Amino acid sequence: MLCLCLYVPIAGAAQTEFQYFESKGLPAELKSIFKLSVFIPSQEFSTYRQWKQKIVQAGDKDLDGQLDFEEFVHYLQDHEKKLRLVFKSLDKKNDGRIDAQEIMQSLRDLGVKISEQQAEKILKSMDKNGTMTIDWNEWRDYHLLHPVENIPEIILYWKHSTIFDVGENLTVPDEFTVEERQTGMWWRHLVAGGGAGAVSRTCTAPLDRLKVLMQVHASRSNNMCIVGGFTQMIREGGAKSLWRGNGINVLKIAPESAIKFMAYEQMKRLVGSDQETLRIHERLVAGSLAGAIAQSSIYPMEVLKTRMALRKTGQYSGMLDCARRILAKEGVAAFYKGYIPNMLGIIPYAGIDLAVYETLKNTWLQRYAVNSADPGVFVLLACGTISSTCGQLASYPLALVRTRMQAQASIEGAPEVTMSSLFKQILRTEGAFGLYRGLAPNFMKVIPAVSISYVVYENLKITLGVQSR
């Protein structure tokens, strides 16, 4: 009689326990599928436990924390189908074998460059007969009990702009795999990212409003500090005033994300790449164009956000009242004040953010991605924080000028100024330091914003039925 005993330790058990299978009376082909070594080197046990947890999560249909025979067989069948599709996608020559060059090409398509020596190292980990190529059987045997479905898992694990929301809107959109696009998982990722952004922006809204106040009102004669800025806001409008401008800031997430995603998919076709995923410079071009289209579409909301953040108690009854008064007093053109420096800021922010993130990602993958492309929470948070900080630092002077231009009519007696004249005025009266007013609260919000958006994103993914990382 066909039977299989699967022992799964209780999660969090203190003692070191090994998972093992016992097969009795099984056909030879099933034995080859079910076999798993009992003796695991201690240094590999941490990775092994991660595999075990992922396998249980992937196959546990009744959510009892362990796999029964039927669940495990279903997991194997489903996983083998996916592995077959991946093998075919990697087999560029269609000869039934994968060599080092094909591995290098597949990773290059994802924007990850590795040497031939590194590709051969990957091959050796799977190559049983020493031919320096991998056939289907070797591929299947190596990956069947490893819940790593494909090399594009790098895309899955290393999503950037979808996961991390630091309040900026200039990042290059993330890539989505063919499977994610075909199954509709892409919109669930976007919804999870939008929800995470809403929570993150709301939690860091006081720092964001302080940044806007310092950008517009701080000067040599009015040296506004962080504590003084918070005190001034609370004294003028109470604690509730710390969240002025947050409503419109959250509201614009949905239309901007949707427009940027659709524009990015169209721009990818225009750049002329026939690959499933774009190379880095192609992503920068397509992402920057998509960002420009999205920003142009929702830019009036950016102006409203700045005006709402700067408003005094009782000045406007709400967003619609603010928009109506701007239209009546200043005309339609007022909704596009600061548009040029905003567009110019896309390239330095998106370019540096993407370049730094990809550099950090590639460095980690080349040095530490032995068994999985999963970097873990802290590596991902560190990479997101560093890349966002570098991008903001490069584009901050343009962001400051944009904000001052957006706020012009809200400052009594402020003359109309152009971008170039405003740059000259700031440099003449405040020096280069004046271009970085408000940078401190802006940097202070990066780490909490990244951390909060990541946690909320992961929880929303579970709610929306997106496969856990």
From Swiss-Prot:
Regulation of protein activity: Activated by an increase in cytosolic calcium levels that induce a conformational change of the N-terminal regulatory domain, uncapping the channel and allowing transport.
GO CC annotations, alphabetized: mitochondrial inner membrane; mitochondrion
Catalytic activity of the protein: Mg(2+)(out) + phosphate(in) + ATP(out) = Mg(2+)(in) + phosphate(out) + ATP(in)
Residue stretches of each Solcar repeat: 184-270, 278-363, 375-463
Mitochondrial matrix-side positions: 208-244, 302-337, 399-437
Mitochondrial intermembrane side: 1-189, 265-287, 358-380, 458-469
GO annotation (BP), single: response to dietary excess
Record flagged with keyword Hydrolase: no
PROSITE patterns recorded: EF_HAND_2 (PS50222), SOLCAR (PS50920)
Transmembrane segments: 190-207, 245-264, 288-301, 338-357, 381-398, 438-457
UniProt KW keywords: Antiport, Calcium, Membrane, Metal-binding, Mitochondrion, Mitochondrion inner membrane, Repeat, Transmembrane, Transmembrane helix, Transport
Protein name according to UniProt: Mitochondrial adenyl nucleotide antiporter SLC25A25
